[in-house]
Amino acid sequence: MILRGENLIKEYGPKKVVKGVSVQVEQGEIVGLLGPNGAGKTTSFYMIVGLVKPTSGKIFLDKQEITNDAMYRRAQKGIGYLAQEASVFRKLSVEENIMGVLQLTNLSRREQQIKCDELIEEFSLQHVRKNRGDLL
């Protein structure tokens, strides 16, 4: 599997914060971008995982374009981003954190709860289901 970003550009008004970044990552590779503050490293990753929509450029998983896929669709395909900061809402429980993400999908409330239950079981989180993030 190959994840590829081609000529990614991100503009906020007149300010171009990412200027034509291209990157290719093969399955199993670990990638980090080095550069000074404000160079567009985080924004580039955000575009690839779907947190930020690129102004232009394309993102592919293998040969399938995923530029317009929502973040949860990319996650279903195995694309994720581990932030430098804590990635859970610390005052919410494990279950509430999972439900928070599932609320971004097109699933009904009942389907969200079923999916949450499945994920908790799949990752063996039953014993910490009601624990707050800051207590894990």
Segments from the language model and where they lie:
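Conserved ABC transporter NBD signature motif
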Residues: 57-66, 77, 115
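Short coil-to-beta microelement around the adenine-binding A-loop and adjacent beta1/P-loop entry
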Residues: 15-16, 73
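Helix-to-loop junction immediately C-terminal to a conserved catalytic motif
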Residues: 49
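ABC ATPase NBD coupling module
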Residues: 65-85, 109-110, 129-130
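Conserved ABC ATPase "signature" region
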Residues: 110-128
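The feature captures the beta-strand-to-loop junction immediately N-terminal to the Walker
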Residues: 34-36
